[in-house]
Regions:
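Conserved sequence/active-site signature of Rossmann-fold short-chain dehydrogenase/reductase
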Residues: 28, 78-79
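A generic "structured core" feature
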Residues: 72, 77-78
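Flexible, glycine/small-residue-enriched loop-and-beta-strand segment within the central core
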Residues: 1-67, 92-93, 97-106
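Alpha-helix N-cap/helix-start motif at helix boundaries, enriched for small hydrophobics
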Residues: 70-72, 88
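Acidic, glycine-centered active-site loop in nucleotide-sugar glycosyltransferases
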Residues: 84-85, 90-93
Length: 106
Protein backbone atom coordinates (compact mmCIF):
# COMPACT_ATOMS: atom_id res chain seq x y z
CA UNK A 1 0.00 0.00 0.00
CA UNK A 2 1.21 3.49 -0.86
CA UNK A 3 -0.49 6.22 1.15
CA UNK A 4 -1.54 9.68 0.01
CA UNK A 5 1.20 12.29 -0.40
CA UNK A 6 3.96 9.65 -0.31
CA UNK A 7 6.99 10.78 -2.34
CA UNK A 8 8.89 8.19 -4.40
CA UNK A 9 11.98 9.98 -5.76
CA UNK A 10 12.35 7.82 -8.90
CA UNK A 11 15.96 8.82 -9.60
CA UNK A 12 17.33 5.27 -9.35
CA UNK A 13 16.02 1.73 -8.98
CA UNK A 14 13.33 1.38 -6.31
CA UNK A 15 12.59 -2.23 -5.41
CA UNK A 16 9.32 -2.80 -3.53
CA UNK A 17 8.65 -6.31 -2.20
CA UNK A 18 5.34 -7.97 -1.36
CA UNK A 19 3.10 -6.61 1.41
CA UNK A 20 5.11 -3.39 1.80
CA UNK A 21 3.49 -0.31 3.35
CA UNK A 22 4.62 3.22 2.46
CA UNK A 23 2.42 5.37 4.71
CA UNK A 24 0.99 8.84 4.23
CA UNK A 25 3.56 11.54 3.53
CA UNK A 26 6.53 9.15 3.67
CA UNK A 27 9.49 10.00 1.44
CA UNK A 28 11.81 7.64 -0.44
CA UNK A 29 14.84 9.75 -1.38
CA UNK A 30 17.22 8.30 -3.97
CA UNK A 31 19.31 11.31 -4.94
CA UNK A 32 21.32 14.19 -3.59
CA UNK A 33 23.95 16.75 -4.64
CA UNK A 34 27.70 16.64 -4.09
CA UNK A 35 28.18 19.85 -2.10
CA UNK A 36 31.99 19.48 -2.24
CA UNK A 37 32.15 20.11 -5.99
CA UNK A 38 31.82 23.54 -7.55
CA UNK A 39 29.19 22.41 -10.09
CA UNK A 40 27.04 20.72 -7.37
CA UNK A 41 26.37 17.56 -9.44
CA UNK A 42 23.59 15.15 -8.57
CA UNK A 43 24.08 11.50 -7.73
CA UNK A 44 21.71 8.67 -6.86
CA UNK A 45 21.60 5.23 -5.24
CA UNK A 46 18.92 2.52 -5.29
CA UNK A 47 16.53 1.88 -2.39
CA UNK A 48 15.14 -1.57 -1.50
CA UNK A 49 11.99 -2.20 0.55
CA UNK A 50 11.97 -5.95 1.19
CA UNK A 51 8.84 -8.05 1.79
CA UNK A 52 6.68 -6.92 4.70
CA UNK A 53 8.63 -3.74 5.45
CA UNK A 54 6.74 -0.66 6.62
CA UNK A 55 7.66 3.02 6.23
CA UNK A 56 5.60 5.00 8.75
CA UNK A 57 3.73 8.25 8.07
CA UNK A 58 6.10 11.14 7.42
CA UNK A 59 9.18 8.90 7.68
CA UNK A 60 12.15 9.31 5.31
CA UNK A 61 14.27 6.59 3.68
CA UNK A 62 17.50 8.02 2.26
CA UNK A 63 19.48 6.93 -0.76
CA UNK A 64 21.18 3.54 -0.75
CA UNK A 65 19.15 2.17 2.19
CA UNK A 66 17.56 -1.29 2.38
CA UNK A 67 14.66 -2.00 4.71
CA UNK A 68 15.16 -5.70 5.25
CA UNK A 69 12.33 -8.20 5.59
CA UNK A 70 9.51 -7.03 7.90
CA UNK A 71 11.46 -4.10 9.35
CA UNK A 72 9.51 -1.02 10.50
CA UNK A 73 10.54 2.64 10.29
CA UNK A 74 8.22 4.48 12.70
CA UNK A 75 6.34 7.74 12.17
CA UNK A 76 8.61 10.70 11.36
CA UNK A 77 11.84 8.68 11.60
CA UNK A 78 14.79 8.92 9.19
CA UNK A 79 16.61 5.82 7.87
CA UNK A 80 20.18 6.66 6.86
CA UNK A 81 21.48 3.07 6.95
CA UNK A 82 20.06 -0.40 6.34
CA UNK A 83 17.38 -1.65 8.75
CA UNK A 84 17.73 -5.21 10.02
CA UNK A 85 14.91 -7.73 9.50
CA UNK A 86 12.05 -7.98 12.01
CA UNK A 87 13.26 -4.89 13.86
CA UNK A 88 11.41 -1.65 14.69
CA UNK A 89 13.39 1.59 14.27
CA UNK A 90 12.66 5.08 15.59
CA UNK A 91 14.26 8.53 15.57
CA UNK A 92 16.60 10.67 13.49
CA UNK A 93 18.78 8.92 12.68
CA UNK A 94 16.67 5.80 13.15
CA UNK A 95 17.85 3.45 15.89
CA UNK A 96 16.54 -0.04 16.73
CA UNK A 97 14.03 0.03 19.60
CA UNK A 98 12.62 -3.50 19.67
CA UNK A 99 11.98 -6.70 17.77
CA UNK A 100 8.94 -6.95 15.50
CA UNK A 101 7.04 -10.09 16.45
CA UNK A 102 4.31 -11.11 13.99
CA UNK A 103 1.30 -13.18 15.01
CA UNK A 104 -1.29 -14.94 12.87
CA UNK A 105 -1.17 -15.79 9.19
CA UNK A 106 -1.93 -14.02 5.95
Amino acid sequence: WIGPRAWLDNLDTLTIGNNVVISQGAMIIQGSHDYKKVDYPTYSKPVVLEDGSWVGAGAIVTLGVTLKSHSVLTVGSVATRDLEPYTIYQGNPAQPVRERVLVGTM
